[in-house]
């Protein structure tokens, strides 16, 4: 039966727009119109289903190509941080005592609801800031030290690109070695296996999900890698015409180019995710390889969580979630 399910999975061509995210002992699944969070707390499964409201539905201009990529990226980050905070609430840090005086003062001034919004906004800001610092500004800063020794813009761009890739891969590898992150990456694998099972048209059972691949071509890991690659290509082109020796000019331009870079990456991933041919499979390979670091084989209890989260967002109208 397992072999039959595996063969059926490989033959399937359906691609769903449903995507997910691994949480602390849980999984977030986002479908058309709603998202679901399922967490395995010490007291059992906790479920939270929310209706999805997209900013680009309210403001159509934000749904235009390129622009929608940046909007979707920020929106996903905000929702992802909220989901992580929700899951973390069920596993409080035993080493943390009573709330600090600052926490008490902040809650008193803002109220609990506003304080949660403030913390979420701060977390998103720090996450976005760290990403920009590590993968965009730090490589430019480090490459600035070689300016006195090179005269070619092409060589400078090459060195900066190599530094950027080294930082990216080092970050991925270091994250994969963290013990606290190992189980999160197992849930990441569970999310992928469950999506594959659903796309294959198989019943969502632990047995059927267990045999699926844990590397998915439309994973966020692939998106981040493509962002880095696109930024290298765009930067190399732009800095061939701009004052490439001025480190501060380069940093400022990196910031200005972020929106088009993320936008182009989003459109690229949409195309690759929606087509299955030799070219798209080749383009998807680097992202699939990187998932060796960001996914681990899940156990059956994790698959149960991912299955439940997916079940909660599958639309009643068949095909509504088609890619």
What spans do the regions from the language model cover?
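Hydrophobic alpha-helical membrane-embedded segments
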Residues: 64-86, 160-185, 258-274
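Juxtamembrane "helix exit" motif at the C-terminal ends of alpha-helical transmembrane segments
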Residues: 86-87, 127-152, 227-253, 266
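Select subsegments of transmembrane alpha-helices in polytopic membrane proteins
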Residues: 117-135, 217-228
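Hydrophobic alpha-helical transmembrane segments of multi-pass membrane proteins
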Residues: 122-133, 158-162, 166, 252-259
